[in-house]
Amino acid sequence: MNFSKSLLLIAFGGTIGSIFRYLLQYWFGNVLGYSLPWGTLTANLLGSFLIGVVYAISDRFPLFDPQWKFLLASGFCGGFTTFSTFSYETFQMLKSGHYILFLGYICLSVVGGIGFAFAGVWMIKNF
């Protein structure tokens, strides 16, 4: 595949993913408030699930066009999920003395992200 085309697919997917993450964070911030960064957590968990689905589909169906992986996995999921925001939010919790929230958020994010990725793979392999 053409390198320039790959970059364009990643850029387009990343743009859409970033917009979706912003909308999700905006919605959660207005509905649930900011006691826990629900938008970031939800984006990271859903993105982990989706990347599991994309890679499982590409493994299961050899004719799956690799361009979709660039668009969906590297692009959309890369823009939708955010390790840097997660890191900043956990630092703010620690700095504010919210130690239990800090530990809970780390556990939910890391274990949940891995679990959601496995769930995405499992779903494709079993259906």
Swiss-Prot record:
It is found in: Cell inner membrane. Na(+) is not transported, but it plays an essential structural role and its presence is essential for fluoride channel function. GO terms for molecular function: fluoride channel activity; fluoride transmembrane transporter activity; metal ion binding. It is a multi-pass membrane protein. Fluoride-specific ion channel. Important for reducing fluoride concentration in the cell, thus reducing its toxicity. This is Fluoride-specific ion channel FluC. Belongs to the fluoride channel Fluc/FEX (TC 1.A.43) family. Na(+) binds at G78, T81. InterPro entries: FluC. It catalyses: fluoride(in) = fluoride(out). It comes from Leptospira interrogans serogroup Icterohaemorrhagiae serovar Lai (strain 56601). The chain crosses the membrane at residues 8-28, 37-57, 68-88, 100-120. Keywords: Cell inner membrane, Cell membrane, Ion channel, Ion transport, Membrane, Metal-binding, Sodium, Transmembrane, Transmembrane helix, Transport. GO terms for cellular component: plasma membrane. One of its GO terms (biological process) is fluoride transmembrane transport. Signal peptide: none annotated. Pfam families: CRCB (PF02537).
